[in-house]
Amino acid sequence: PVINTMFAFAKIRGAESIYDTKGGLMHGPGGESYYAAIWANDQAEYINPFFPYLGYEVGNRSALCSYEHFARFMNPEYKPLPSSIIAEGIDVWAGAGDRGDAAMVAYGASRYALSKGDKAEAEKLWPLIEWCLEYCRRNLNKSGVVASDADELENRFPAGKANLCTSSLYYDALISAGYLGKDLGKPVAAYARQATALKKNIDRYFGGTVEGFDTYK
């Protein structure tokens, strides 16, 4: 009962603050403050893939809206996506550099599309997913893991030039995009090969022993 109650409150907290802005429906972190901004982690990665399970159509619409905002920043030069799209969609924040934001969006958009099960929406999201995966591929370092300026903690703690979180998100995005692309009839064999190689590289680069336990660092 305690866990059920906690989860019930979490569902309310996760869905209570969605604002109808001039940039469309935008999900906020909860509470009573008007917060017309979206993040590659808070919305694209965390809450959006959950909304289809909640069955809350306003949440689903806000999720699609957020991905459409990030899709505006795809570019042929493969410059980083902004970390946050603010002020009802008319400005951005990228104060921590590349936090692995493309990996966050690729993971979240793939998971959202799989969970929602709407083919038309999935087709709309597919170019964004492809772009984000290609961005990550282009930013692999010599060890075959994704390089970035920071992680989601934005340098509150040292993250080095490559971090486990970003490469793990990219790995899951490759797997999830493979499932999604298969349903959509897209060529996805390369994603499976890239995921296999990335898994080995993650183990080599981040694997370690901490206090006698085989883990990651």
Regions found by a protein language model. Give the residues of each.
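Substrate-binding groove/exosite segments of carbohydrate-active enzymes
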Residues: 1-123, 215-217
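Extended, well-ordered alpha-helical scaffold segments
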Residues: 5-9, 58-71, 118-136, 177, ...
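Conserved helix-loop functional segments at active or binding sites
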Residues: 16-20, 72, 76, 111-114, ...
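Aromatic side chains
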Residues: 34-35, 112, 126, 135, ...
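Short, glycine/acidic-rich beta->alpha junctions
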Residues: 41-42, 128, 162
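Short alpha-helical basic/polar micro-motif
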Residues: 44, 127, 168
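Catalytic cores of carbohydrate-active enzymes
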Residues: 81, 141-152, 156-217
